[in-house]
């Protein structure tokens, strides 16, 4: 008999043939299955757009229709993320604000929330220390707890906090949200929980 090896085992991203044929704009769909990824030399005038899941898709030989529908939905939203430059690691967030907006959102707390945070982090609650406590202690610790990179931005921190809270509130991730829409969804959910 003859031995046959699926091309995915030898080269699971067959990009080379498209580059060799002279295509300049290539959309690469990644599923991160078994196999190798062959190195391809890409010229500077070739644009590679990558759609890749941020979660594991599981085994390639699982044939579950419900999981397949979920993967199709995930692929659709990951494609929207790539095309429209959506932010977020879990959610699909359309944002366009400047860095100072996110800093303001992170430090603008009412007195009760500020007091709660200062108590949780065992910091002095003097009003004169407000800015320094938040920017030099609380926000860097939050970034570390959320496992952000060492050179995190206020935008990254705010979106990470927003996403972590949305996940805890079990808000559906399969929708494109603006920052305000996701924050409002969270507030609605939290208001509903506190009303019980």
Where do the PLM segments sit?
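Patatin-like phospholipase
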Residues: 1-196
